[in-house]
């Protein structure tokens, strides 16, 4: 199982997202659990990022919402950002 850490920015983005759309909490929780069990599950559309976000990865929570993360080891990741496609990929 994948071990998760969260960057402070991720936590504030998550809180902001849940405050605006409380119904997303359950969906996010389910996708994170799925990711922890099998990051390669095709339902996640997990993929490496390029250009300025090279060495980072992302998976889909909904059609628009992504979780951006980085691998810290073979079975450890740090969540960096969560939000709409335009928000998490703007950096």
Where are these regions (language model features)?
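Conserved N-terminal entry element of GNAT/NAT acetyltransferase domains
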Residues: 1-7
């Amino acid at each position: 199982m994948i071990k998760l850490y969260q960057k402070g920015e991720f936590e504030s983005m998550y809180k902001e997202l849940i405050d605006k759309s409380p119904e997303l909490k359950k969906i996010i929780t389910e996708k994170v659990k799925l990711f922890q069990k099998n990051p390669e599950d095709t339902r996640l559309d997990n993929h490496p990022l390029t250009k300025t976000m090279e060495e980072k990865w992302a998976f889909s929570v909904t059609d628009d919402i992504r979780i951006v993360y980085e691998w810290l080891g073979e079975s450890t990741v740090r969540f960096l950002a969560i939000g709409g496609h335009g928000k998490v990929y703007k950096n």
